[in-house]
Amino acid sequence: GLGDVYKRQVQFWADKETGCSKNFWLRSTGWYLMALVDCIALCSEQLYEHYRALVDIFRESIRGVLAYRAEDGLFYQVIDHPEAEGNYTETSGSAMIAYSLLKGVRIGVLDAEKYLPIALDVFEKLAANKLRAEEDGVVRLTDICWVAGLGPDKNPQRDGSVAYYLSEPKKSDDSKGVGPFIMAYSEYLRAKQA
């Protein structure tokens, strides 16, 4: 079946048994969580079986990622290797997680009593730690991984290793961070007004 396609090792960077990448890159996890919560929000009762499956996957994924929350309240560029030299709490993926948590609470698939305080805290820590005023008064959104990815085999540097993910440059005000930050902020405002 289709599931077998995802288990096969088809890329040079993939684990030969699982077909998965060796490590967990934060922004890819953030994209996944955002896609899940946005699809859940669009599902109708006619798709109830699929809706329940998506909700279960979303909840499990949220529990999993929260286990790796950093001391500053955000999430590392390589999620499960906080000890790696040069690893840092990355802005775009942390914003995506904040958005996913806040929207998950708002649409009722995450328990508000348990997850709303966490969701609010992630966003507040994101704003406090990653919005920085420059000497000229311009406020910048910092520590955004500029670009990362896997493959192709013509570019073996993009091998999914911790070293690779941490070698990509950080930028300020990159749209891949600003967009999710604005989305998270809109959910934050809705939560605060509720």
Task: Report the location of each language-model feature.
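Short, small-residue-biased leader/transition segments that mark boundaries at the very start
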Residues: G1-Y6
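A short secondary-structure junction motif
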Residues: R8, C39-C43, V65-D72
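Zinc-dependent metallopeptidase catalytic helix centered on the HExxH motif
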Residues: Q11-W13
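Solvent-exposed loop and edge beta-strand segments that line ligand/cofactor-binding
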Residues: D15-M34, H50, R69, L74-A95, ...
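Extracellular polysaccharide-recognition and catalytic grooves
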Residues: C20-S21, I57-E60, G64, Y68-A95, ...
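Well-ordered alpha-helical scaffold segments within catalytic/enzyme domains
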Residues: W31-H50, A95-L110, P180-Q193
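Hydrophobic core segments within long, regular secondary-structure runs in both alpha-
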Residues: L33, V37-I40, Y51-L66, A98, ...
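CBM-like carbohydrate-recognition segments
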Residues: T89, V105-A194
